[in-house]
């Protein structure tokens, strides 16, 4: 086990550049086009002239739906699946974050069309809990997963252990994950000291923690070190520091604050900018992480859970003759 990100397998085996990540996903894209050239046929109810009828529509394989790298509906849905299962079992956030990383890494190499996504989520949570030293009884885990997704999770717990071997193979047994949460704690302590003297409220820290949680939906954990993500989330938090959201979500408030040039003139923002300059953090990576968050929240506003659930139900439960 590596106690430092800089000597870890996360950095040396699972950190990509944007170009190398795009190359890996292009390989999967081409494989999907070969394996599933027919796309996905879905049956939709339509009403014309007062008469209800069913129509069949084809979603081409080249469409973004059900491609993890392109479909934010799918990304956000996966995030909620892990969180729902985690809440039922009272699993701590570190383990759920590790499960998110396992899922993201796995879906670089495998398509949701060739595996059971719900089994993948269950197995990622099961393995992450073991690695993060908060193991769950497999029967309890499977029981809770079946309560949430009875159509997709078989009652036999050995199916999860079988999937675990598949998951371990794709992860190449590199399981230790370093998260931004620890970096956040360290940076907050530094900010309290001179010359910065920035003390964040409990609400600010909670907002920052939530931003880090949301960041697991996008690719930043595959691209940048944990401290970059922590700094980016702190930057967003400080940008909306003390500003009422008027009932809007943290997501919308963050997006609006980053686009508002007046934020750069606040004393807290000036002090934090000084911290970033003196710490020699890679500003390009920080700004790209912030942009990734804004892009995520723009897509989140358009999130359509019923649509992605419908597609997955059609994909996994359709009769063999319809494939």
From Swiss-Prot:
<keyword id="KW-0010">Activator</keyword>
<dbReference type="GO" id="GO:0045944">
    <property type="term" value="P:positive regulation of transcription by RNA polymerase II"/>
</dbReference>
<dbReference type="GO" id="GO:0051321">
    <property type="term" value="P:meiotic cell cycle"/>
</dbReference>
<dbReference type="InterPro" id="IPR013763">
    <property type="entry name" value="Cyclin-like_dom"/>
</dbReference>
<dbReference type="GO" id="GO:0000411">
    <property type="term" value="P:positive regulation of transcription by galactose"/>
</dbReference>
<dbReference type="GO" id="GO:1990508">
    <property type="term" value="C:CKM complex"/>
</dbReference>
<dbReference type="GO" id="GO:0000979">
    <property type="term" value="F:RNA polymerase II core promoter sequence-specific DNA binding"/>
</dbReference>
<dbReference type="Pfam" id="PF00134">
    <property type="entry name" value="Cyclin_N"/>
</dbReference>
<comment type="similarity">
    <text>Belongs to the cyclin family. Cyclin C subfamily.</text>
</comment>
<dbReference type="InterPro" id="IPR043198">
    <property type="entry name" value="Cyclin/Ssn8"/>
</dbReference>
<dbReference type="InterPro" id="IPR006671">
    <property type="entry name" value="Cyclin_N"/>
</dbReference>
<keyword id="KW-0678">Repressor</keyword>
<dbReference type="GO" id="GO:0034605">
    <property type="term" value="P:cellular response to heat"/>
</dbReference>
<dbReference type="GO" id="GO:0000122">
    <property type="term" value="P:negative regulation of transcription by RNA polymerase II"/>
</dbReference>
<feature type="domain" description="Cyclin N-terminal">
    <location>
        <begin position="45"/>
        <end position="176"/>
    </location>
</feature>
<keyword id="KW-0539">Nucleus</keyword>
<dbReference type="GO" id="GO:0005634">
    <property type="term" value="C:nucleus"/>
</dbReference>
<keyword id="KW-0805">Transcription regulation</keyword>
<keyword id="KW-0195">Cyclin</keyword>
<comment type="function">
    <text>Component of the SRB8-11 complex. The SRB8-11 complex is a regulatory module of the Mediator complex which is itself involved in regulation of basal and activated RNA polymerase II-dependent transcription. The SRB8-11 complex may be involved in the transcriptional repression of a subset of genes regulated by Mediator. It may inhibit the association of the Mediator complex with RNA polymerase II to form the holoenzyme complex. The SRB8-11 complex phosphorylates the C-terminal domain (CTD) of the largest subunit of RNA polymerase II RPB1 at serines 2 and 5.</text>
</comment>
<protein>
    <recommendedName>
        <fullName>RNA polymerase II holoenzyme cyclin-like subunit</fullName>
    </recommendedName>
</protein>
<dbReference type="InterPro" id="IPR036915">
    <property type="entry name" value="Cyclin-like_sf"/>
</dbReference>
<dbReference type="GO" id="GO:0016538">
    <property type="term" value="F:cyclin-dependent protein serine/threonine kinase regulator activity"/>
</dbReference>
<keyword id="KW-0804">Transcription</keyword>
<comment type="subunit">
    <text>Component of the SRB8-11 complex which consists of SRB8, SSN2/SRB9, SSN3/SRB10 and SSN8/SRB11. The SRB8-11 complex associates with the Mediator complex. The SSN3/SRB10 and SSN8/SRB11 kinase-cyclin pair also associate with the RNA polymerase II holoenzyme. Interacts with ASK10.</text>
</comment>
<dbReference type="GO" id="GO:0016592">
    <property type="term" value="C:mediator complex"/>
</dbReference>
